[in-house]
Design a protein with these regions (language model features):
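Pre-DFG segment of protein kinase catalytic domains
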Residues: 60-62
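Conserved protein kinase catalytic/activation segment
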Residues: 56-58
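A short linear hydrophobic-aromatic micro-motif
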Residues: 46-47, 96
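Peripheral (often C-terminal) accessory segments that flank ATP-dependent C-N-forming ligase machineries
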Residues: 83-131
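ATP-dependent carboxylate/phosphate-activation module, predominantly the ATP-grasp catalytic core
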Residues: 1-41, 45, 52, 64-89
Length: 131
């Protein structure tokens, strides 16, 4: 495991997806992820999602074979995971990322785009829109 950031969700959509979260200091999910990915002989980005119960027990909920959707939070916390992945893929020497800043927060937002119907037709016909 060359890099890992633990994020706690605290804003969820009705489908359980995080729209806000915070980096936390908790080595247990990192240890569990390391064990799981080693057992799978996994190479490449991955996200292991755990549920922690009130007794402090962790339950694996899912494994995603990609970077997490909150990847920018990892970078804000001090780990550039895509760069690390490229360096590993290119057989470049890397120093495992073993620390990050706890207390970094992300909030996902949505922005509306207003277009004229002609612009939609232009996009459909040409693949681009001139604004």
């Amino acid at each position: 495991l060359s890099g890992a950031v633990v994020m706690k969700k605290f804003g969820l959509t009705p489908k359980g997806k995080a729209f806000s979260g915070i980096t936390v200091e908790d080595d247990k999910p990192v240890q569990l992820t390391r064990q799981i990915l080693k057992s799978l002989k996994w190479i490449g980005p991955a996200e292991c999602e755990f549920l922690k119960d009130e007794k402090g027990h962790y339950f694996l909920m899912e494994i995603n074979s990609r970077f997490p959707s909150w990847l920018y939070l990892a970078a804000a916390a001090g780990q550039n995971l895509p760069l690390l992945t490229v360096q590993l893929a290119c057989d470049m020497p890397v120093r495992p990322l073993t620390s990050y800043t706890a207390g970094k927060l992300f909030v996902r937002t949505v922005a509306d785009a207003l277009l004229d119907a002609r612009q939609i037709m232009e996009l459909t016909a040409s693949g681009e829109v001139r604004l």
